[in-house]
Swiss-Prot record:
MF terms in GO: DNA binding; DNA-binding transcription activator activity, RNA polymerase II-specific; DNA-binding transcription factor activity; DNA-binding transcription factor activity, RNA polymerase II-specific; protein heterodimerization activity; RNA polymerase II cis-regulatory region sequence-specific DNA binding
Name of the molecule in the record: Nuclear transcription factor Y subunit gamma
Organism per entry: Homo sapiens
Residue stretches of biased makeup (Polar residues): 339-351
Assigned keywords, A-Z: Activator, DNA-binding, Nucleus, Transcription, Transcription regulation
Subunit field text: Heterotrimeric transcription factor composed of three components, NF-YA, NF-YB and NF-YC. NF-YB and NF-YC must interact and dimerize for NF-YA association and DNA binding.
Compartmental location: Nucleus
Length: 458
């Protein structure tokens, strides 16, 4: 054991004096030990015995061995503490730290076996400097882009229409904004509305090419809603949104049809623009309605026809020709040729016919199969109406009134340029669910302030 008196300094302190007299005092205590002194130890003997049993080579432990190890450990701890306390006093501190023990181990060779157990802080690699963490907003919102198609081709923030690119104003997209691109007559006017904390809805209105009021044929063009999601990494993902339009049972035509057109399973959205209509009326131009169609896939049409044929027991009424005398203003009666048993206008449903309708003549509402009110058809059955309209004028003048009788529906009041147009559709609900009233989808005139059209359901 070492009996050095200190770190070599001339000046002696309390710790150095205690260290110099440490070993002579310890030797004196060992010589004066008695049997009673071995019974009481400062360190627990049971814990020392448990540590000794960790060695697999140790089979048995005598009663004197733990006592000797306890006494030796006590002397070792006392000497190491005194040497560490000297380093504490040199640093003018009153608290013993881990670094003090490490310095005492490195300065004395007898403690070399503890270097790996208690390494010096200086030998440690420098601590990693705390990186400046970027402020991350909680749950950074994802940008959503919704495209509302008012024309046969979808118009986005930067899209193409009629084969020519429609350039819209470039806007700076902030996180948490919902941008809705919607074409409208007039100039491009971005409108921003605050909808919630940290979220904005921006409506961008793009001016289409050419005459926007000209009726567009929906051949090969469908209305599709694409949802573009920009992730936190900057990648843009386009996810198509499936429209739950259901199966259409009644189709209401409220616009002029040029030539011969067969309407089969199509959803038509009617929209009028009062400002453009007034401008054309003042210039002597006829007013036209904007028509958009949503094509239903051929598979859904075939499935609907099969279900309809099963529901009507093979008796499928096909309307071949219908002359709309209300649009031409002629006094000719409305004639409809149907392949089936036509019954006079004695339907139990509240139906109002135009003045030109003759009593007993076949009509669309009367050609429908009579259904009992007590036994309604299955909710999943489909009724497809195939109408071929011909002999209609190519234009709808502003001073004409439009009457469109529908099966099972009361007559509507005359439509005016400033009046809202609705799309009437009856959706077939799944089995076990009934739709009490039809849905009314309002396609309102786009006001000058840039607000989006409203959708109401009664």
């Amino acid at each position: 054991m070492s009996t050095e008196g200190g770190f070599g300094g001339t000046s002696s302190s309390d710790a150095q004096q205690s260290l110099q007299s440490f070993w002579p005092r310890v030797m004196e205590e060992i010589r004066n030990l008695t049997v009673k002194d071995f019974r009481v130890q400062e360190l627990p003997l049971a814990r020392i015995k448990k540590i000794m049993k960790l060695d697999e080579d140790v089979k048995m432990i005598s009663a004197e061995a733990p006592v000797l190890f306890a006494k030796a450990a006590q002397i070792f701890i006392t000497e190491l503490t005194l040497r560490a306390w000297i380093h504490t006093e040199d640093n003018k501190r009153r608290t013993l730290q881990r670094n003090d023990i490490a310095m005492a181990i490195t300065k004395f060779d007898q403690f070399d076996f503890l270097i790996d157990i208690v390494p010096r802080d200086e030998l440690k690699p420098p601590k990693r400097q705390e990186e400046v963490r970027q402020s991350v907003t909680p749950a950074e919102p994802v940008q959503y882009y919704f495209t509302l198609a008012q024309q046969p081709t979808a118009v986005q923030v930067q899209g193409q229409q009629q084969g020519q690119q429609t350039t819209s104003s470039t806007t700076t997209i902030q996180p948490g904004q919902i941008i809705i691109a919607q074409p409208q007559q007039g100039q491009t006017t971005p409108v921003t509305m605050q909808v919630g904390e940290g979220q904005q809805v921006q409506i961008v209105q793009a001016q289409p090419q050419g005459q926007a009021q000209q009726a567009q044929s929906g051949t090969g063009q469908t209305m599709q809603v694409m949802q573009q999601i920009i992730t936190n990494t900057g990648e843009i993902q386009q996810i198509p949104v499936q429209l739950n339009a259901g199966q259409l049972q009644y189709i209401r035509l409220a616009q002029p049809v040029s030539g011969t057109q067969v309407v089969q399973g199509q959803i038509q959205t009617l929209a009028t623009n009062a400002q453009q209509g007034q401008r054309n009326a003042s210039q002597g131009k006829p007013r036209r309605c904007l028509k958009e169609t949503l094509q239903i896939t051929q598979t859904e049409v075939q499935q609907g026809q099969q279900q309809f044929s099963q529901f009507t027991d093979g008796q499928r009424n096909s309307v071949q020709q219908a002359r709309v005398s209300e649009l031409t203003g002629e006094a000719e009666p409305r004639e409809v040729k149907a392949t089936g048993n036509s019954t006079p206008c004695t339907s139990s449903l509240p139906t109002t016919h135009p003045p030109s309708h003759r009593a007993g003549a076949s009509c669309v509402c009367c050609s429908q199969p009579q259904q009992s009110s007590t036994s309604p058809p299955p909710s999943d059955a489909l009724q497809w109406v195939v109408v071929e309209v011909s002999g209609t004028p190519n234009q709808l003048e502003t001073h004409r009134e439009l009457h469109a009788p529908l099966p099972g529906m009361t007559s509507l009041s005359p439509l005016h340029p400033s009046q809202q147009l609705y799309q009437i559709q009856q959706v077939t609900m799944p089995a076990g669910q009934d739709l009490a009233q039809p849905m009314f989808i309002q396609s309102a005139n786009q006001p000058s302030d840039g607000q989006a059209p409203q959708v109401t359901g009664d």
